[in-house]
Amino acid sequence: MTKLELQYEGKSKQIYRTEDEGKVVIRFKDDATAFYNIKRAKIENKGKMNCAISSMLLGYLNSQGVATHYVEQVAADEQLCRVVEHIPLEIIVRNIIAGSMAKRLGLEEGLEPDNTIFDLCLRGDELGDPLINDHHAVALGLVSYDELAVIYEISAKT
């Protein structure tokens, strides 16, 4: 698959068109950011390591029947992927109370809730990836309630 012109560049990846309109090449960059893009640095081989880890995880999900955009790793820092619609949501699956959730709710880290907890965040450095609820996601036109149900079902499997 031939990598054509750059279609999109983010903080950690570049997306290139290919001759197949249904596929893109994703290149993982050596750039690192922290604190919502305030701190920046280059880390040698970061792109290669992130590509290898991503390829392993996405390949595993595909093998378990969880459809992803991933097709194959085509270079040390590149993947061939299917074109998909990007939904600017981050779904955090919690089976143990930890991190920001423990701090936000004043709970002890390590507690195991009786049910899986899904935190939904709106992706975007300018807002700091704020926590939102299902109704926000639907009202913003990001997803429908039916799509959210599928997202939660798939997230619970992984």
Label for each model-derived stretch:
Residues 80, 102-158:
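ATP-dependent phospho-/nucleotidyl transfer catalytic cores
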